[in-house]
Amino acid sequence: MSAVWMDEQVESSARVQNSLKIEREDHKLEKRLCREVGRAIVDFNMIEEGDKVMVCVSGGKDSYAMLDILLKLQKRAPIRFDLIAVNLDQKQPGFPKHVLPDYLGKLDVPFHIENQDTYSIVKRVIPEGKTLCSLCSRLRRGILYRVAGELGATKIALGHHRDDMLQTFFLNMFFAAKLKGMPPKLVSDDGKNIVIRPMAYVPEKDLTRWAQVRDFPIIPCTLCGSQENLQRKQVGNMLREWEKKHSGRLENMFSALQNIVPSHLMDSKRHDFKNIRTTGVADAEGDKAFDAEEFSEPQRPGLSVIDIASR
């Protein structure tokens, strides 16, 4: 047997092995996404029996992934609920209006395209060079709330993920002087809708990879995506740099959002500092005066789950 023939066999075998490895990794990613979305739904009671969930699909990777995973979970869920995909066509120049209807039409899910020219309003009202996101978001929110009522939706699902929630927390702290984040579930500001974020536990890197696996027809935003100096982007870059230098830090920060100790902050509306009294009973959470705080290495709970699942 010639060396050339043997080399070709080795290369062919390597390609097959590599293909199988990629397939296994993709399958693990799918299981992880379904598990994390399912866990968030259960932890926060996001979807209940008989719900009609309006899934907001923008054409970005996050909303595509949310719809994709919710459709998978719908088939195996212990309760019955309906999904309807909704896209708001804001009449942005160059927006490929056929992409979403074509994509959604191939799925086993009802969908609605809402046509509203918010682009012209935003460009007319906001001075050149100013951030467009605030007004665009308000207009979009009001329209989606109205559409939810017209469609009889009981929940509105948005595609925000773990990184979005962390960014929002730091944005509020840096620029609004508030310890306030992005909730996984909350009544909308009009008091008429319940907004849920099923991907609250999902890191953005998993969604980026899943978009590649599924080959979603991504539609870039010509408004938000074209503004490079947005505060959110700056905070996002900061968090990514932290994670690069200190692996596991984002996981710990996200866990901190679920582990709040009001007595160790300074908000007198959350803790009655004025009327505290001694009890004579030892308390591990009591003040330790001059003792230096001791911190363990980041546990990275999300990654430990992944490692266990991959064995």
Curated annotation (Swiss-Prot):
One annotated Gene Ontology cellular component of this protein: cytoplasm
Instruction: Give the matching HAMAP family.
Output: TtcA
Q: What is this protein called?
A: tRNA-cytidine(32) 2-sulfurtransferase
**How does the cofactor bind to this protein, according to its record?**
Binds 1 [4Fe-4S] cluster per subunit. The cluster is chelated by three Cys residues, the fourth Fe has a free coordination site that may bind a sulfur atom transferred from the persulfide of IscS.
What's the further remark here? The thiolation reaction likely consists of two steps: a first activation step by ATP to form an adenylated intermediate of the target base of tRNA, and a second nucleophilic substitution step of the sulfur (S) atom supplied by the hydrosulfide attached to the Fe-S cluster.
- Which Enzyme Commission number(s) are on file for it? 2.8.1.-
Single GO biological process annotation from the record: tRNA thio-modification
- InterPro entries linked: Rossmann-like_a/b/a_fold (IPR014729), TilS/TtcA_N (IPR011063), tRNA_Cyd_32_2_STrfase (IPR012089), tRNA_thiolation_TtcA_Ctu1 (IPR035107)
Source organism per entry reads Polaromonas sp. (strain JS666 / ATCC BAA-500)
Instruction: Report the subcellular localization.
Output: Cytoplasm
The family this protein is said to belong to: Belongs to the TtcA family.
Name the enzyme group at the top EC level. transferase
Annotated signal sequence range: none
Q: What does this protein do?
A: Catalyzes the ATP-dependent 2-thiolation of cytidine in position 32 of tRNA, to form 2-thiocytidine (s(2)C32). The sulfur atoms are provided by the cysteine/cysteine desulfurase (IscS) system.
Pathway, per record: tRNA modification
Which Pfam families does the UniProt record give?
ATP_bind_3
Q: Where [4Fe-4S] cluster is bound, by residue?
A: 133, 136, 224
Where's the motif PP-loop motif? 58-63
Q: Which domain of life is it from?
A: Bacteria
This entry's Gene Ontology molecular function terms read: 4 iron, 4 sulfur cluster binding; ATP binding; magnesium ion binding; sulfurtransferase activity; tRNA binding
Name the lineage. Answer: Bacteria, Pseudomonadati, Pseudomonadota, Betaproteobacteria, Burkholderiales
